[in-house]
C-alpha cells in the first residue's frame, strides 16, 4: 500500500511491473535482532492480544478448512492479510541482487534503540554510506510486537527516509513516511489500515497539494470468502494539473495445505504467483508477469534452501530472460557475524555481477 509516492513524476528506468501499484519509498533498514519492525500491511500475529483474526498462511488454511468441515460452520473466517502482501510470500524466495562490497554494523544501545552503519563499495553504482536508527516503543501487543516503531535512514549526501508506524487501536494501524533528497523535501505519505476478523481495508494518501490540486489516493480491500479463498481489489486515483486518472485491479488468493496461489488482474496487466513449501528446509515459487503497456511477459522460478543446524541459507532463481541469480548467507557462530555472497549472470547480455557482504551484530 505504500507504493504511491513516485506516481507524480514520469516513469524512468526499466519498465514497471504490470501491477497498477506505483513505486514508493525505499524500504527501511532491516530491524535488529530482538527488535520488531512490522510493515504497515503486516499481520497482527497469532500471538497478538488484539483479538482479531490471524492472517491466513498455507499451514493455517488447512487447519481452518478442517475445523470448518468438522463443525459444519463457515462463520469463523480468517483474516486474509493485506492486498499488497498477496505476492510477498513467493517474492521472498527470490535472491536480491548485490554488487560490490557491503559492510553492515548493527549496534544495540538499549532494548528499544539501535543504530546501524552501512558502507557499500561498488564498481557500477556509486559508493555510499548509510546511517540508520530504529526505535521500538513500549506499547507491547505481543511477545514479538511493540509500538510505536520509528525508523530512519540517512546517506552521506544528506538524503533521508523516515517512517513512523503505530497501532492506534486493536484493529487500526497507521504509518507516516517522508523522503528528502539532500536538502529538498521530495515525498510524504500517510497510510491507514483496518483489520477486521475476516477482511482488511486500507487507504493511502500520497503527496497531497491543495494549492496545486494534485495528489494520489489508493484504496485496498481484501475479504475472506471461504477459509481458503480471499478476493479483493485496488483502486488508484491520481491527479495533477492537466491530468487525472484512475486505475483499478482485482486480486484473488487461494491458500490450501502447504501452497499458496495468487493472481492480480488489472488494466496494467496480470501478475500471478505460486508458492509451495516442499519441506521445512525447501520452498519453491513461480512468478508470471504480463504487461499490457510494454507488450511483454516474463516468467521466473525461485527457491530457498534453509539449513538452520548448519546456519546456512541459499536462494536461487532463473527467469525467461535467461538471468540466473543466487545468494548465500552463512552465520558464523559463536561470533555475531553473517557472511553473504551474491552472483547474477545475464546470458543474453553476457553480463556478470557479484557481491560480497558482511554483517556484524
UniProtKB/Swiss-Prot annotation:
The gene is Tomm40. Keywords: Ion transport, Membrane, Mitochondrion, Mitochondrion outer membrane, Porin, Protein transport, Transmembrane, Transmembrane beta strand, Transport. It comes from Mus musculus. Channel-forming protein essential for import of protein precursors into mitochondria. Plays a role in the assembly of the mitochondrial membrane respiratory chain NADH dehydrogenase (Complex I) by forming a complex with BCAP31 and mediating the translocation of Complex I components from the cytosol to the mitochondria. This is Mitochondrial import receptor subunit TOM40 homolog. One of its GO terms (biological process) is protein import into mitochondrial matrix. GO terms for molecular function: porin activity; protein transmembrane transporter activity. It is a multi-pass membrane protein. Residues 1-73 are annotated as: Disordered.
Amino acid at each position: 500500500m505504500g507504493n504511491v509516492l513516485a506516481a507524480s513524476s514520469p516513469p524512468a528506468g526499466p519498465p514497471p511491473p504490470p501491477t497498477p501499484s506505483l513505486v514508493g519509498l525505499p524500504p527501511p533498514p532491516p530491524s535488529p535482532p530482538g527488535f520488531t519492525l512490522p510493515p504497515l500491511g503486516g499481520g497482527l500475529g497469532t500471538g497478538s492480544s488484539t483479538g482479531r483474526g490471524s492472517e491466513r498462511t498455507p499451514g493455517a488454511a488447512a487447519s481452518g478448512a478442517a475445523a470448518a468441515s468438522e463443525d459444519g460452520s463457515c462463520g469463523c473466517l480468517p483474516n486474509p492479510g493485506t492486498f499488497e502482501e498477496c505476492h510477498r510470500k513467493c517474492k521472498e524466495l527470490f535472491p536480491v541482487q548485490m554488487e560490490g562490497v557491503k559492510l553492515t554494523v548493527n549496534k544495540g544501545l538499549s532494548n528499544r534503540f539501535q543504530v546501524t552503519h552501512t558502507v557499500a563499495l561498488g564498481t557500477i553504482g556509486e559508493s555510499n554510506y548509510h546511517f540508520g536508527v530504529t526505535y521500538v516503543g513500549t506499547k507491547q501487543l505481543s511477545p514479538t510486537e511493540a509500538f510505536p516503531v520509528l525508523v530512519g535512514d540517512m546517506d552521506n549526501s544528506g538524503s533521508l527516509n523516515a517512517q513512523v508506524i503505530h497501532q492506534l487501536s486493536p484493529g487500526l494501524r497507521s504509518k507516516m513516511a517522508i523522503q528528502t533528497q539532500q536538502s529538498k523535501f521530495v515525498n510524504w505519505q500517510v497510510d491507514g489500515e483496518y483489520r477486521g476478523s475476516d477482511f482488511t481495508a486500507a487507504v493511502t494518501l500520497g503527496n497531497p497539494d491543495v494549492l496545486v490540486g494534485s495528489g494520489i489516493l489508493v484504496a485496498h480491500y481484501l475479504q475472506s470468502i471461504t477459509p481458503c479463498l480471499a478476493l479483493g481489489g485496488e483502486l488508484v486515483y491520481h491527479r495533477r494539473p492537466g491530468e487525472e486518472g484512475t486505475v483499478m485491479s482485482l486480486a484473488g488468493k487461494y491458500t490450501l495445505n502447504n501452497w499458496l496461489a495468487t493472481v492480480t488482474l488489472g488494466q496494467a496487466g496480470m501478475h500471478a504467483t505460486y508458492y509451495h513449501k516442499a519441506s521445512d528446509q525447501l520452498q519453491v515459487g513461480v512468478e508470471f508477469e504480463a504487461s499490457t503497456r510494454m507488450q511483454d511477459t516474463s516468467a521466473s522460478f525461485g527457491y530457498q534452501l534453509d539449513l538452520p543446524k548448519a546456519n546456512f541459507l541459499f536462494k536461487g532463481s532463473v527467469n525467461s530472460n535467461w538471468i540466473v541469480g543466487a545468494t548465500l548467507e552463512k552465520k558464523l557462530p559463536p561470533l555475531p557475524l553473517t557472511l553473504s555472497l551474491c552472483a547474477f549472470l545475464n546470458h543474453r547480455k553476457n553480463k556478470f555481477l557479484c557481491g560480497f557482504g558482511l554483517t556484524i551484530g
